[in-house]
Curated annotation (Swiss-Prot):
This is Glutamyl-tRNA(Gln) amidotransferase subunit A. It comes from Synechococcus sp. (strain JA-2-3B'a(2-13)). Belongs to the amidase family. GatA subfamily. Residues 497-510 have a biased composition (Basic residues). The gene is gatA. InterPro entries: Amidase, Amidase_CS, Amidase_dom, AS_sf, GatA. SUPFAM superfamilies: Amidase signature (AS) enzymes. Allows the formation of correctly charged Gln-tRNA(Gln) through the transamidation of misacylated Glu-tRNA(Gln) in organisms which lack glutaminyl-tRNA synthetase. The reaction takes place in the presence of glutamine and ATP through an activated gamma-phospho-Glu-tRNA(Gln). Its EC number is 6.3.5.7.
Amino acid sequence: MSVIRALHRQLVTKERSAEEIAREYLERLAQLEPQLKSFITVTEELALQQARAVDARIRAGEAIGPLAGIPLAVKDNLCTQGIRTTCASRMLEGFIPPYESTVTARLAAAGMVTVGKTNLDEFAMGSSTENSAFQRTANPWDLTRVPGGSSGGSAAAVAADQAVVALGSDTGGSIRQPAAFCGVVGLKPTYGLVSRYGLVAFASSLDQVGPFGRTVEDVALLLQGIAGHDPMDSTSLKVDIPDYSQALIPDIKGFKIGVIRDLLGEGCGEETRAAVQAAIQHLQELGAEILEIDCPSFRYGLATYYIIAPSEASANLARYDGVKYGLREPADSLLSMYGKTRAHGFGPEVKRRIMIGTYALSSGYYDAYYLKAQKVRTLIKQDFLKAFEKVDVLVSPTTPTPAFKLGEREDPLSMYLCDLMTIPVNLAGLPGLSLPCGFADGLPIGLQIVGNALQESKVLRVAYAYEQSTDWHKRRPPLGQPSVKEGQGSDPGQPQAKRRSGKRSKKSKS
């Protein structure tokens, strides 16, 4: 059952109050935080304030929506007015935005309870959340392994019941890959379906905000709360938003599902391949027609992405110069200040990608690299369009392997290969979802479901049908009992963590 629906029922029947629920999640968050390090900032005071406001509405007899009173975690690259937004970078360590991102504003208006800002790879550049300037987040299933990235803090928080749902951003797989590693559901919406206003930019033509949840329905409900046109975002689509909960039908008889042959071959681990093939067989047993699909351009997706994304990043990150906001290193000249600020403010991976992007955009190399990459991007889009002439959705593994050990992949190329299966979806701007489909040595494996543009409903329907006929989503990491799904108490055996203030003021600290 959806966690959101279960809690909503408890709230409207007055079985429990929003403040009680918020306190239990905050307690569990504090208990597990020394082990997981999912959060950069915990907004306890804000959460309790928002929860009390929901309780006041209920006492007044006001009807509340399904998201009201639900604990939410927010990736720390989404601007939150009065609460620092660091992007896990020394460059923005003390930055307190004077405005609110559209998605967080919409969820606050819906009555959600923000428990904190989650850890990520610096400026969302990474696949393991090891590139954070502040801390390394651990995977709740195995504390010696990564949670994925760049939205690793959000995925870990949902998997460990530190929050009911969370927001992440996905540029090359940064929602789907950590969702797979942490055994939760994560959705990257169609590019432009969700506003990017207030999202600190990495690669503007690829970035998209999306939801994490323990179930497909939780993700659908959160997507409902954030989707829709925003005049503050020039890339926002003017389209009607369907009721995504209406797509949650456990019947896919007659659906045509394409298996991306290119993503099940070389580079895919044996255990992952076996789990995904079993999931495909299960979808067939549910009545879907399975077709094999060739997408030959996908093999060039990784190289294409690592030209386009760093090129856009090099332009976007040029604004961090020590003049307007963020870190400023003392220096005896303007040029020296630029150099010292950027040298001390950015971590190694961010510097690497800025250099790659600057090189690709430089005179004499623009045509050979950037322009050619854009042409290949068009070919990838065309391969998807051809595939969707034959099928309703496409499926593949989300990641080549389950979560790897912390510190295991020091070579940048081996880290980049983690996003091999998710990157083409970003290049084409399509919706993609990951949900659990098995385990290997106690670690979750993710199934990726991809739809045509604005076909989130089809993606959610197939995911829901699979989820409702399996029990992978019901498994929990070995971190004690969940805090409030069924009104259970939190695990008293975990150490207490220091609480941190989260007032909407310039005094917010972590």
